[in-house]
Amino acid sequence: MLELSESNIHLNANAIDKQQAIEMAVSALVQAGNVENGYLQGMLARELQTSTFLGNGIAIPHGTLDTRLMVKKTGVQVFQFPQGIEWGEGNIAYVVIGIAARSDEHLSLLRQLTHVLSDEDTAAKLAKITDVAEFCAILMGETIDPFEIPAANISLDVNTQSLLTLVAINAGQLQVQSAVENRFISEVINNAALPLGKGLWVTDSVVGNVKNALAFSRAKTIFSHNGKAVKGVITVSAVGDQINPTLVRLLDDDVQTTLLNGNSTEILTALLGSSSDVETQSVEGAVVGTFTIRNEHGLHARPSANLVNEVKKFTSKITMQNLTRESEVVSAKSLMKIVALGVTQGHRLRFVAEGEDAKQAIESLGKAIANGLGENVSAVPPSEPDTIEIMGDQIHTPAVTEDDNLPANAIEAVFVIKNEQGLHARPSAILVNEVKKYNASVAVQNLDRNSQLVSAKSLMKIVALGVVKGTRLRFVATGEEAQQAIDGIGAVIESGLGE
């Protein structure tokens, strides 16, 4: 978990352009002891590769993979530019978060920040806030608790002909949850409820509100109070904006009808907007693709941006979910939400497309992911096959075969082992040492046993292939030095691997 202090936050900053804003972020990171002086070039180089603008006025400049060694300790520096900074392609950044992180710290840190910043209203607040403590609290999510209504807060079929009884039931329930103080109770009991119409009434208080909460009670039979119908009472405790969408829904005719006639589940769904606000991935006829991420560093900003660009080529609505983390379903066109999924190497992603070009979209995404989304990927195929299916079909078919799942730039060769004793521990170790010389991912397969491709950098896995004299081994390499790796492997096998 990222620790952010007020000293890391710089409000009401000024910069003439994006480069100066990045320079300010790096200077603050250097002064805080997070990075070495040369880190600036890494941040500028990253911007040339892919813009770090996430959306909602937020940019997250950070270094390239080559500059991670210059990071002394993980940290961030946050700058607020109320006037906005042009960040390219017409995007305006109001909050710039300079990040220094190594290895997977980069993804976890981004995930934490984007979880807070994915809300447009929150991002808009951060662009204008003048109090450092409040800015820090919102950025760290300390004041952004999701608004929920427990099922216990819905009381139905109350046998009463008293409006005050319904109010008291609600107030008591809110008090049990520590959502209100005693003065709130006194206020709603002693002051008249307000009629919404259709037999619904509302009570609240300007004092004694502790946290956002709502309770609803409904009489078994309708009755009259001062000449007006009474069927149900809503009692509200409000301390933050998170409850506002629910308050707006109280004015909706359909929601009011549900309050008057629905069961507890239907009422909760209507009040929280669950039926319309939550993404779904179970539409009949939708095309579903399940793919494994093979990028060594997962889906950080650059491959995520490439994924978004691929998605935007198609007109279909496309959502995605990180199955490995059991994440929520998000739009595959939102860079911020994709980065927030915290996808690392080996994670399984589920895409659902709905529309005329849904099948083409999912097939294209599968190929783009298999090819690394602009980065080098492991030559070892995923442990589970990538699949594409159509919702409602009974057949669940692999999207690609193992060979099809190899990156397009993979280089492979087949060599015959000549060692009299095959590949026991010693020659296997020499083979592994040769493979590790190269900046490449190398997988190996025993063709004679039709084994799976396994990492050629694992001594245990090579020995487990059961290679004897005359065995044909297939090597597949990807990466900058793939060809050199294949050539080196061929040479060392030809020389007998030290025997």
UniProtKB/Swiss-Prot annotation:
Gene3D superfamilies: HPr-like (3.30.1340.10), Mannitol-specific EII, Chain A (3.40.930.10). Residues 2-142 form the PTS EIIA type-2 domain. It comes from the Bacteria. The modification Phosphohistidine is found at H62, H300, H424. The keyword Phosphoprotein applies. GO terms for molecular function: kinase activity; protein-phosphocysteine-sugar phosphotransferase activity. It is found in: Cytoplasm. Keywords: Cytoplasm, Kinase, Phosphoprotein, Phosphotransferase system, Repeat, Sugar transport, Transferase, Transport. InterPro entries: FruB, HPr-like, HPr-like_sf, PTrfase/Anion_transptr, PTS_EIIA_type-2_dom, PTS_HPr_His_P_site, PTS_HPr_Ser_P_site, Sugar_PTS. The keyword Transmembrane does not apply. GO terms for cellular component: cytoplasm; plasma membrane. Induction: Induced by fructose and repressed by FruR. Residues 286-376, 410-499 form the HPr domain. The phosphoenolpyruvate-dependent sugar phosphotransferase system (sugar PTS), a major carbohydrate active transport system, catalyzes the phosphorylation of incoming sugar substrates concomitantly with their translocation across the cell membrane. The enzyme II FruAB PTS system is involved in fructose transport. PANTHER family: MANNITOL PERMEASE IIC COMPONENT, MULTIPHOSPHORYL TRANSFER PROTEIN. The PTS EIIA type-2 domain is phosphorylated by phospho-HPr on a histidyl residue. Then, it transfers the phosphoryl group to the PTS EIIB type-2 domain. This is Multiphosphoryl transfer protein. It comes from Haemophilus influenzae (strain ATCC 51907 / DSM 11121 / KW20 / Rd). The lineage of its organism: Bacteria, Pseudomonadati, Pseudomonadota, Gammaproteobacteria, Pasteurellales. The gene is fruB.
